[in-house]
UniProtKB/Swiss-Prot annotation:
It comes from Shewanella frigidimarina (strain NCIMB 400). It is an enzyme of class 4 (lyase). Pfam families: DHQ_synthase (PF01761), DHQS_C (PF24621). Catalyzes the conversion of 3-deoxy-D-arabino-heptulosonate 7-phosphate (DAHP) to dehydroquinate (DHQ). Zn(2+) binds at residues 183, 246, 263. It catalyses: 7-phospho-2-dehydro-3-deoxy-D-arabino-heptonate = 3-dehydroquinate + phosphate. The lineage of its organism: Bacteria, Pseudomonadati, Pseudomonadota, Gammaproteobacteria, Alteromonadales. This is 3-dehydroquinate synthase. Its EC number is 4.2.3.4. Keywords: Amino-acid biosynthesis, Aromatic amino acid biosynthesis, Cobalt, Cytoplasm, Lyase, Metal-binding, NAD, Nucleotide-binding, Zinc. Belongs to the sugar phosphate cyclases superfamily. Dehydroquinate synthase family. One of its GO terms (biological process) is aromatic amino acid family biosynthetic process.
Amino acid sequence: MQQIQVQLGDRSYPIYIGQDLMNDSELFARYLTNKKALIVSNDTIAPLYLQQIQQAMSACARIETVILPDGEKFKDLQHLDYIFTELLEHNFARDSVLVALGGGVVGDMTGFAAACYQRGIEFIQVPTTLLSQVDSSVGGKTAVNHPLGKNMIGAFYQPKSVIIDTFCLQTLPANEFAAGMAEVIKYGIIWDADFFQWLEANVDALKSLQTDALNYAIAKCCQIKADVVAQDETEQGVRALLNLGHTFGHAIEAEMGYGVWLHGEAVSAGTVLAAQTAYKLNLLDEQSVERICRLMQAFDLPITAPESMGFEQFIKHMRRDKKVLGGKIRLVLPTEIGKADVFSDVSEDLLKQVISCV
């Protein structure tokens, strides 16, 4: 088992990475002994893993469970209320713990519920998708969607620990694995050119779910994320770089309907649009754009936006993006493989050119 620490003073917490961790009763006992715990999962993950995690936790905690419908379209205030209702009906107190068993949707909703319930209770992330293991479970971003924008209602609220059981990836559908790889590739583009090159050389190993390759990639991403969050927890500076591709990507998700495109698929297309924007601004060379496109395609990810989306469909959502300041759209753009920056002077005319060329 590998362990990575997110350094946030008295709110620091560990990320555990390994196989069969969901059966590790001693690991759960560190956080749940003599406590009441509510497991939040969905109707896809629960049949696969709920029973074993209940067995691991039952030796140390009193357990209740709430099962949500699976999908991004259910990440809303209505379904968040299911969690609150369960907590209230079973008299959960401030010393209780929420346990998120699922992908990014379950993790985001559980974390937000923990932040809100009785003004804050503890929660643990047990991410089951590649995307949630390498990105959304780490760093304390919690939220639900609104029809007018993704993740618009939420809070920064850190978990007590993140428990990554890599065995879960054996049951992950191929398109969900690919979606997670979009976030993995992102780390190479914004932060680590050597890691990007390693990804280019290990496509087959990763797609065939080779344990050593997966463990290395997951640990590398978690370490980068932990380092970034330690520097900038609430996204006032360097953490914004983790949003590469997300301004375009969130527009795709909102316009197409949440869940029609997986988050990682939208981030993939959005990352390519960001790279093409950087090329138009003479910030990024053509070879780097091509490398980004090839690597996304190697993992069966889309590199173009939906045909039905033109400039007007993009821009109405981009103007509502959380990174907008002073009425200006701020974009994370790569300047070379391994480096990126935030730009607030990208004109809508140039964005129109980029989107129209896709």
